[in-house]
Amino acid sequence: MKKYPKIGIRPTIDGRQGGVRESLEEKTMNLAKAVAELITSNLKNGDGTPVECVIADGTIGRVAESAACAEKFEREGVGATITVTSCWCYGAETMDMNPYYPKAVWGFNGTERPGAVYLAAVLAGHAQKGLPAFGIYGRDVQDLNDNSIPADVAEKILRFARAAQAVATMRGKSYLSMGSVSMGIAGSIVNPDFFQEYLGMRNESIDLTEIIRRMAEGIYDKEEYAKAMAWTEKYCKKNEGNDFNIPEKTKTRAQKDEDWEFIVKMTIIMRDLMQGNPKLKELGFKEEALGHNAIAAGFQGQRQWTDFYPNGDFSEALLNTSFDWNGIREAFVVTTENDACNGVAMLFGHLLTNRAQIFSDVRTYWSPEAVKRVTGKELTGMAANGIIHLINSGATTLDGTGQQTNANGEPAMKPCWEITEGEVEKCLEATTWYPANRDYFRGGGFSSNFLSKGGMPVTMMRLNLIKGLGPVLQIAEGWTVEIDPEIHKLLDERTDRTWPTTWFVPRLCDKPAFKDVYSVMNNWGANHGAISYGHIGQDVITLASMLRIPVCMHNVEEDQIFRPAAWNAFGMDKEGADYRACTTYGPIYK
C-alpha cells in the first residue's frame, strides 16, 4: 500500500480558563471530528484508500498547544491543515505557521460565540505574515448546538482538501525524463527550477539507451513479460489494423511480431524506471529495482528513438490507462514527446480526480463552414458552432474511448476502483492498433486508434512557462461530442486515420477567449493539452492558487472560484488579483 500525506485538523479555542474555554471544548472538538469525517468519507487517494485526517490531541488555545500540534503533524506525515473554531481565539498564537502547508480556516457562523470574528482576525494575520490561507464562512447562521456542516461550507472544505492533498502528494516526488528534447518542443525543454520551486519535485533523467540495456541484459521480470505477451495477443494484437504504409515501407509479419514483443518489454521497463520493481531485486538487480520515485514521466521518442526503434505509442497508451495485464490499477502519468509542461497539467488532473488523463495535440479547429465545404454536410447539435480535433500519435489513454459508464449509464472515465472487467474489455475492443505510419515513425511500432464517445464533460488544461512571468495555466471546460460518422471519416482520414480522436467543444461565455470555439483554439498556448474527465476547472483554479500559478484563461463561473482570502486584497478584478498575488507571494519552495 502506498503512503499518502494526511490532512491535519486544528480545533482552536478561546484560551480563557475558568468557564469560557471549558464551555467550548466539546463543541470545538465535535466540529473538528465532523470535518475529518466529511473528508474521509468523500475523498480518496489514487489507489482508492480514503484520505486520512489527523486531529490535534486537544483544542488549541495558546501557543504551546499550537507547537505541540505542529510536532504531532510532522510525526504523522500531515501535508495540509484545516483550522476549525466556533469562537474567538488568539489569532497569531493559534494559527498554523508552517510555510509549506496549504491552510484553510473554518469559522463557525453563530451568534453565541464569535467564530467569524476569529476567522477575520486570523486571516488578517495570515495575510500580514505572508502565509496565505483559505477562509471558510457559512452563509447561514447556525445554532450553537448544531454540529452539522452546511452544504456551502462542505463544498469549500472538500475543494480545499482535494487540492491540498494534490499539493502534498506531489511534494518530494520526481518527474522522470526518458530521453531529452523532442523535435524542439518547448514543453520538453524541462525546467528544473519550476519543478523544484513551484511543485517541490525533483527532476530525474535517463538516456533512452537504458531501455535497450535492460532489454539486452534481461533486466525485467520474465514471468511478467510472458503474462503480458499472452494478454497483448488476446486483447491488442487481435485488433491489429490494416497497414497503410506503402509496400516499400511495410514490415513483414515476422517483423511486426518482433515489434509487439519489443513494445511490451518496453512498457514493463518504462514502468520499472518510474516506480521500481521489487522483483528485480530478487533477480539480483538491486539498483534497477529502486526506480526513480516518479509520479510522472515523459518519453522523448521522436526523433532519434522512433527513427530506429518501434515507437512509444503502445507503452504510453497502456501506462496512461487504468488497466493492463496485471488487472485494473491506478493510471500512470506519461507524456508523449517528454512534454513536461503538459505532464504537469495531466498530473494536476489526475491528482484532483483520480482518473486517467487524455494527452492530445490540440490539432485543428473545424469551423461549420469548413466542414460544409470539405464534407458537404453540416455540423449539428453541440457541434453546430465548430469543433476542436484532439488527436495524438496513438498514446492517449484507452479510458478515453468512453466505454466506461457512470451510474446514469452515460459514457465516462472512472477512478480505477469503479471500473469493471466488462468495461476493460469494452475499452480494448473499441481500440484498433495500426502499424505505425513509417513516414513519421521509421522504426515502426503500433499506434492506437479509437473515437471517444460524445457527451462526456471534460476539462482541457495546459501549463505554459513564460519568460519574465513564470508558469501560467489555461483551463477550458467543455464536452466530447459525436458527429455524423461520414463527417468524422472524412475529417479523420485527411488528418491521420491511425491515431485516436476526441472531438471537443468548449463551453462558450462572454470572455474574449471563449466568445466562440475558434477563439479557444486561437488562444491556446501550446501544441498539446491535458484533458480530464469532469468539469473540474474550479478545483484546478484552487490548486493553482495554492501553488502560486496564475490562471490566464478559463471559463469557470466567478462564484465558483475559491482562492486564499489574501487574494481579495489585490483588487476586485479576479484575474488581475490572481496575477498580483502569485507574483507577490512567489513559489512555495523557493
UniProtKB/Swiss-Prot annotation:
Active site: 337 (proton acceptor), 361 (proton acceptor)
GO biological process: D-arabinose catabolic process; L-fucose catabolic process
Catalyzed reactions per annotation: L-fucose = L-fuculose
EC number: 5.3.1.25
UniProt cross-references to InterPro entries, sorted A to Z: Fuc/Ara_isomerase_C, Fuc_iso_dom3_sf, Fuc_isomerase_C, Fucose_iso_dom1_sf, Fucose_iso_N1, Fucose_isomerase, Fucose_isomerase_dom2_sf, Fucose_isomerase_N/cen_sf
This protein's pathway: Carbohydrate degradation; L-fucose degradation; L-lactaldehyde and glycerone phosphate from L-fucose: step 1/3
Role this protein plays: Converts the aldose L-fucose into the corresponding ketose L-fuculose.
Family classification: Belongs to the L-fucose isomerase family.
Name of the protein this chain belongs to: L-fucose isomerase
Higher taxonomy: Bacteria, Pseudomonadati, Bacteroidota, Bacteroidia, Bacteroidales
